[in-house]
Amino acid sequence: MKAGEGDTKMSRCSVDARNSRVTSRNLNVIELARRRKRGRMKYRQLGSTGIEVSLLGFGMWPIGGTQHAGDYGNVDDDAAVAAIHRALDLGVTLFDTAPAYGNGRAESILGTALGTRRRDSVVVTKCAVHWDYAKEQWVTTSNREAILASAEQSLQRLRTDYIDVLLIHVPDPEGSPAGSMAAFRELVDSGKVRAVGVSNFTTEQLDEYRQHGSIQVQQSGYNMLDRRTETKMVPYVSANDIGFMTYGSLCHGLFSGTWNSKTSFAAGDWRSKGDVFGLPLFLGENLAKNIEMANRLKEFAESRSHTLPQLAIAWVAMHDFVGTCLAGMITPAEVEDNVTGVDWSLAPAELQEIDRILAGAAGTEGADHYVVK
């Protein structure tokens, strides 16, 4: 070592260390400011993806409106965009959509709304389901070509060059796990997708697909009335470090706090058939009984200065195995109300009272998982 070289290196190291500390301190200030802006939102890691997500996720299905069979009622685009912006302001980072939601409409609205705020969001979308105009029905196709084509179309509608999480929407009875996983690998290797997973799968189907690659995320229905995933799916995803997204936190509107004895559904609304993902919660007399039960839960929540949606979200969010719990939202007011739910910690005595009220529900018996027909 030449004379003075050691001193020079030490000096350079000291400067580098000092700059590193300054940079770290600046980043901490930025991070604190960012979190203050987010308010009381909580965040969790989504399994092994390395992606941090808001505990409350924005469910985009209702925003798809009524385009084809299986959608919700009409939704105002401007209100939907305002709701997305408000969610971002309050710290919601995860947005869950799909080509099937309004036949691409929900993706397009999300892409428009995010704009320059795309970097503040985690976009989850899906593939393998499309509308067949000739047959006038939804078709499931999860072969390699279909997945690649669907992803490209989603990227265009979302106005982005990458998707954070891409899920197979529903199991394809005629699909090839090897072909699906090959498509996933191509998309990840190209940088168009960060993480991959599935939705509405059984543990047996997960086993089959995982023989051909890594499944990082599973999405299933889960709420106070639908606890079927607790039997097999929850232990499975926990044991295999698979990120668990739950949908239906508000039981598809039942826990919105707005239903009453006069509640009915439009002809194009999927809930009009009464079946809620394999449970007859809204069928015949069950609907009236469950609305009555929900109103008792509403009274319980209001006696504690909360709303029914906040109670429903708090109940799902309290479970450590949940990476993010989705709730459908179509207005800024709904966003503001729902966000508060993740900050409510339910006491043991409150949980016992909730279970007593839930005992009056109807149509909760079913298989230990939702079977896609």
Q: Where on the chain are the PLM-derived regions?
A:
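Active-site beta-loop-alpha junctions enriched in small/polar residues
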Residues: 61-63, 98-100, 126-130, 168-171, ...
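Terminal-tail/helix-coil boundary detector
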Residues: 36-41, 81, 265-303, 318-323, ...
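Conserved, mostly hydrophobic/aromatic
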Residues: 46, 58, 80, 95, ...
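N-terminal binding-site loop/beta-alpha segment at the start of enzyme catalytic domains
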Residues: 28-121
